[in-house]
């Protein structure tokens, strides 16, 4: 699309103002489907792009995010395309191997921070964290140590303050991470069993 066409049509310019591309992934949510119309004018045909938007442009996946427009607000949650695979994925440290324990438990904190940054809703954060916790426990991590490290991180790290966005105190978060995992076997669905 030439710049003259965009400048002559302010509505068209506005529709593309929040569009972005990272390598082969396009983000054009809430674009009224215009990207599909103009994509061949914007990008060369040799460039194969992934445009993951649903038909109504109110939902898309981009990199590792699900993005939905709900009541005129963007609601994000974590998207991992490996969840869609018809087989189990084995990842993250397995303490039965010859690797240091401290770094392995650090993976839990790093992933929890990533989940908190990506998930707008508390329930999405808890669900992802429970899946990870179960996977790490199956890979010989100690559940009590995981929880203690999480508490220490949330209370002692400036990055742990991100948890404040959910409006729950430490007692509620820990309660949900312990009791929900005991009452809902669905959190084992992504875990590879030995």
Feature map (PLM): residue ranges:
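Charged structural interfaces that engage phosphate-rich ligands
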Residues: 1-194
């Amino acid at each position: 699309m030439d710049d003259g066409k965009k400048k002559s049509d302010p509505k068209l310019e506005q529709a593309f103002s929040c569009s972005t591309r990272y390598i082969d992934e396009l983000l054009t949510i809430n674009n009224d489907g215009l990207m599909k119309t103009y994509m061949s004018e914007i990008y060369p045909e040799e460039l194969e792009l992934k445009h993951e938007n649903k038909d109504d442009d109110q939902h898309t996946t981009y990199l590792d995010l699900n993005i939905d427009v709900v009541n005129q607000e963007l609601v994000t949650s974590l998207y991992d395309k490996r969840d869609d695979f018809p087989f189990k994925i084995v990842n993250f440290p397995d303490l039965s191997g010859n690797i240091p324990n401290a770094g392995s438990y650090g993976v839990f904190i790093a992933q929890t921070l990533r989940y908190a940054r990506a998930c707008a809703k508390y329930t999405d954060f808890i669900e992802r964290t429970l899946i990870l916790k179960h996977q790490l426990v199956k890979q010989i991590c100690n559940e009590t140590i995981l929880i203690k490290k999480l508490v220490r991180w949330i209370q002692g790290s400036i990055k742990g303050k991100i948890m404040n966005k959910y409006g729950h105190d430490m007692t509620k978060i820990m309660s949900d991470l312990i009791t929900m995992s005991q009452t809902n076997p669905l959190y084992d669905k992504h875990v590879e069993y030995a």
